[in-house]
């Protein structure tokens, strides 16, 4: 009976310390994306770019511009690293990643969203 009483006393603590839920963000034109497989970096400098999250295995970028998240597909790690280290992240983003309309080099309308992130 002592073991059962000990377990019952500990049960609320075990439940309270359950697994942490991964952060999920709402990506414009796509929907919710779990960031559990991403490496994210907050951008501390004055920029419209405020967060950069990258899943290197899937070559998938989620970026926050002001308060809105956008996504980019089939983007290589070198381009993301250059974005992270760029003196002006907004200028680098505009020139090398975004594009205009559907002609962006990593636009998810012309490059497939990784299967694990499809809705």
Task: Give names to the regions the model predicted.
Residues 6-16:
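Bacterial N-terminal signal peptides
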Residues 1-4:
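Positively charged n-region of N-terminal signal peptides that target proteins for export
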Residues 24-119:
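Acidic/histidine-enriched, beta-strand-rich ligand/metal-binding domains
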Residues 18-22:
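Sec/Tat signal peptide C-region and signal peptidase I cleavage site
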């Amino acid at each position: 009976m002592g073991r059962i009483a000990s377990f019952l006393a500990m049960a609320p603590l075990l439940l309270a310390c359950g697994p942490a839920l991964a952060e999920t963000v709402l990506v414009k034109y796509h929907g919710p994306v779990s960031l559990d497989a991403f490496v994210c970096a907050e951008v501390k400098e004055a920029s419209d770019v405020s967060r950069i999250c990258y899943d290197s295995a899937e070559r998938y970028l989620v970026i926050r511009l002001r308060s809105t998240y956008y996504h980019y597909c089939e983007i290589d790690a070198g381009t993301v690293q250059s974005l992270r280290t760029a003196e002006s992240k907004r200028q680098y983003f505009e020139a090398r990643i975004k594009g205009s309309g559907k002609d962006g080099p990593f636009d998810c309308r012309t490059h497939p969203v990784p299967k694990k992130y499809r809705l």
